[in-house]
Each structure stands twice: as structure tokens, then as C-alpha cells.
Amino acid sequence: MNALQDQHVLILGLGASGLAMARWCARCGARVTVADTRSAPPQLAALQRELPAAQFISGAFDAALVVGTDVRAVFKSPGLSPLDVATVIEAANTIGIRATGELGLFSQALADLKATQNYTPKVLAVTGTNGKTTVTALTGLLVERGGKSVAVAGNIGPTLLDTLIQHLAAGTLPEVWVIELSSFQLEGETGFEPSAAAVLNITQDHLDWHGSMAAYVAAKAHVFGATGLMILNREDPQVMAMLPEPVRVKLQRPQLRAHVTFGADLPRRPGDFGLEQVNGMLWLVRALEADETLKNRKGETPELFLQRLMPADALRIRGRHNAVNALAALALAQAAGCALGPMLYGLRDYRGEPHRVAPIGIFNEVEFFDDSKGTNVGATVAALAGLGSERKVIVILGGEGKGQDFAPLVDPVSRYARAVVLIGRDAPLLRAALQATHVPLLEAESMAQAVALANAQAHAGDAVLLSPACASFDMFDNYEHRAQVFAQAVGELASAAGAAWEGAAP
């Protein structure tokens, strides 16, 4: 691991990933300079304490950071958009300096470990607009239950490089890495080669950062590399469009790249995963060839046998969208060679991630769900469809809309919502978009008022869902704070009503 030895490296941005890259580069013997447009970025004290030899530069990101210096590599923090660092990256490219990010450093580290220690772990990667954290955490649990050592890292932490440093120090390099990757981390990365990768879905998000939907989709597609198994949501046309055209081989059928699909419908190919309704019960299923000993004629579709894995009701995570998340996790863990039986027990035990359609309690036969992490339209569409397949939903929407198109909410609100309560800065935009649904649209000035209005609209057996489809910063510190205020409001409402409160205390 001496590619960085005695090299001068420049790190752009001093957040969690920037600090992790600085630690890694210093560990590898590099001379480190960190630049940030802020005079006191959040990790500056940690950098100065842990790496006193590192230089910190505050100011604009301009070409002078690399031109006329002895910098030999530039590493960009994922929070910085291409526009933020364009001047530096273009200057670096012009003079032949490599520029990458934490994922590129992590990939190089694994290549070095393979060369020096014959370390060849399976690497499973997860991306998509929504569901990444749930599928990443669940895949890690399934791999562990499948009997393999595993490290889970990436987008929301811990960072890839800090996790690698910890395992190297402890002598516990895992057999499998499960990593969550955002479009920010994947932007511009071309050397990443996972064993298998999943794209869960694609809906509008971060367009202000990427500049266009096409650029956002292209960044997500980098997750597959050139050779890894592709795990694809077959119900999402933009995801399926990532599958390359078949390669024509002389005297053979055109060869499709290795892939597995999943979705809420029936699987169509051997090895694919899906959902099947049997006598009113929804099952997780996998398609197998009915008779693998029979060779199919050219162009003939193999006869399928659907292997029922477990009822969706046996999952602790709620909603059809979470059943689909479970299928994606099964496909990923299976790609790492994990046995199916132990993984199914793991699925039953998984309780979900905080603020992602998380049940927080029931009173007066109405169940309350916290999906405060639903900060974009796609997340809320999935939450409504997931919960609405079983009951009517009163949904709390609103906040900072980030310039999104709210039109995709019209269909699920029309189908699944009994009422909508609007909060926050972009409530008027949501009202305009949802007017055609003819569902009651109420407005609240505070979360407490929103909860009270939602509860008043609910019937026994309904769900009240906080899934704002918007960022939180107009009214709250962050989405966790929004969730905390929601839970507190629900608890206070139950107490004031003198109702029995079944579930988590706020």
C-alpha cells in the first residue's frame, strides 16, 4: 500500500469523508493538504489534533491549489458538487494529476491489499434514490446470518476508509463488504468494481447538485462497474435501461450481462425475486427453472417454478415497498454465497432503520408512522403505496421541496390517502399539485397542529404517516429533529385524550 508514499495529495472538503481521506493518505505515507471554502469546517479541530503535519488552506477552490505545486493527486469530498470543484479538477486533469474521491481511494486500497495480502473480499454495493440505508443494513445482517464476517459502511457512515483502517488495525478484515453509495460518492468514479451491486429505484432528487436528471442517473449507473453482477428493479424503466445491450458472439446466442431482477410483481426469469399473492397472503418468492436438466430450444422461455420463501407478513418492517427491499437484500447476500435458510431467519428479525416508515405507536386504533427520512417525492410515493395496500392513510407532507416536481404524488394520494395535512414553506406548491386528487387538503402551522388534524381525520384501522417528501430545514434542524417533534406531538395527543398508548414512548 505504498502508491501514496511520499506523494503530496490535496483533499477538497473537510467533512467526515474529507477527514477519513486525510487519515488514510497520512497512514499511507503521503504529505496531506486539505482545502475548504470555510474558515472553520466541522472537522478542522480533529484534523489538527490527529494529523498535525497536515496543512489546511481556507479559501476559494481555484487552479492555484494544483498549478505550480508538487501535488500529485486530488481527492474530492462527496458533498462537493462538480460545479463547486470544476476549476480545480479541470486544472488537475490538464496537467495529468489524477482526481477521484473516497470510493476511488477505497478501491485502490482493496487492489493493494489483494496484491500484498491476497485479500479478495466480496464487495456488495447499494444505491438508489430511496431505500439505500434499509437495504444496506439488512444485507449486512443477512450476510452475518449466512455465516460470513462482514463490514457495513458508506454513505451515512461510518466512512469506507475509517472502517477499513479499524479492521486493518484489529486484524479483522471481513469476508464481505456491504457499502451504501450515494450519487455524490459515485459521481465521476469509473474504477469501482463490486462483486454485485443493486440500484433500487430512480426518482428525482439532488438535481440542483447534479445539474440534470441524466447526470444523476449516469452517476448512479457507475455503481455496477464493468463486470459485477447487476441487481435491478425490473419495475423501474430507468434502472432497467442501465442493463447493457446483449453482446453478439459468433455462433452463439447474444450474451446478456449477468443480472438478477427483483420487484413487487411475479419474477420472470430463473434466479429473479418477486412477490406472489396466494389465497390472500403475499409471499416473497424466487423463480427457479422447473427442470434444469432440460435444455431449452433457441429462443424458448424456460418453464418456471416459484419457490415461496416466506410470507411478507412475517417481516417486521411494514409495507409492500419494504418487502421489495427485502428481496433486493436477499439477491445481494446470495451473490456473496450466503445460504438461503439462515438468511430467511435474519429477515424475520430485522426491525428496520429509524425514521423510515417506522411504527411509533397506536392509540384509538390508529397507527402512527415516522418516515421523516422521506425527503423526496419518490420516498413518499413508496411509503404511501406500501402502507396504503392495507389501509387508508392520512399523510403529513411539506417542507422545502428542493425544486421537485410534486406531480408523481397525485396518483398514490388519490388511491391511498383519506386526507393530506400540509406543513412548511412549500405547502402552497403541494396544494396546487394535489388539488386534482379531490382528497381533503388541510394546512397546519406546526407539527403539533398537523398531528391533531391528521388524527381528527383518521378512522379506526387507518394510519397517520409523516412522510414529508421535502427537506426539513424550513421548520426543523434536520429530519431527525422533525421526527422527534412528530413523536412528541403524537405522545402528547394520546396523553391529552387519556388514550391507551401502545408502542414506543415519544
Swiss-Prot record:
Gene3D superfamilies: Mur ligase, C-terminal domain, Mur-like, catalytic domain, NAD(P)-binding Rossmann-like Domain. Pathway: Cell wall biogenesis; peptidoglycan biosynthesis. GO terms for molecular function: ATP binding; tetrahydrofolylpolyglutamate synthase activity; UDP-N-acetylmuramoylalanine-D-glutamate ligase activity. Keywords: ATP-binding, Cell cycle, Cell division, Cell shape, Cell wall biogenesis/degradation, Cytoplasm, Ligase, Nucleotide-binding, Peptidoglycan synthesis. ATP binds at G128, T129, N130, G131, K132, T133, T134. Pfam families: Mur_ligase_C, Mur_ligase_M, MurD-like_N. Its main location: cytoplasm. It catalyses: UDP-N-acetyl-alpha-D-muramoyl-L-alanine + D-glutamate + ATP = UDP-N-acetyl-alpha-D-muramoyl-L-alanyl-D-glutamate + ADP + phosphate + H(+). GO terms for biological process: cell division; cell wall organization; peptidoglycan biosynthetic process; regulation of cell shape. InterPro entries: Folylpolyglutamate_synth_CS, Mur-like_cat_sf, Mur_ligase_C, Mur_ligase_C_dom_sf, Mur_ligase_cen, MurD. GO terms for cellular component: cytoplasm. It is an enzyme of class 6 (ligase). Cell wall formation. Catalyzes the addition of glutamate to the nucleotide precursor UDP-N-acetylmuramoyl-L-alanine (UMA). Belongs to the MurCDEF family. This is UDP-N-acetylmuramoylalanine--D-glutamate ligase. It comes from Albidiferax ferrireducens (strain ATCC BAA-621 / DSM 15236 / T118) (Rhodoferax ferrireducens).
